[in-house]
């Protein structure tokens, strides 16, 4: 059986933590930032965890992570 391929777009967006949870970056931070408040932009910094309902989909896309 051939090797499973990693979805490269998912590999660039997600990283697996040591405990097994998957981290992702926040959305809505790329452009159109002038109308967003400073507080809103500050809260969009950093990383967030992938929700449990999306975990199976992400794991399928990252078979070797």
Curated annotation (Swiss-Prot):
Keyword terms, alphabetized = Ribonucleoprotein, Ribosomal protein
Cross-referenced Gene3D superfamilies, in alphabetical order? Answer: 4.10.410.60
Q: Which GO terms describe its molecular function?
A: structural constituent of ribosome
Query: Which is one Gene Ontology cellular component term of this protein?
Result: cytosolic large ribosomal subunit
**Gene Ontology biological-process annotations:** translation
Q: Does the keyword Repeat apply?
A: no
Kindly indicate where the leader peptide sits in this chain. none
Q: Which InterPro entries match?
A: Ribosomal_bL35, Ribosomal_bL35-like, Ribosomal_bL35_CS, Ribosomal_bL35_sf
Task: Quote any Pfam family the record assigns.
Answer: Ribosomal_L35p
Q: What is this protein called?
A: Large ribosomal subunit protein bL35
């Amino acid at each position: 059986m051939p090797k499973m391929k990693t979805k490269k777009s998912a590999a660039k967006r997600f990283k697996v933590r040591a405990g097994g949870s998957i981290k992702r970056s926040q959305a809505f931070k790329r452009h159109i930032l002038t109308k967003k408040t400073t507080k809103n932009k500050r809260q969009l910094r950093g990383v967030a965890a992938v929700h449990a309902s999306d975990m199976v989909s992400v794991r399928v896309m990252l078979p070797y992570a």
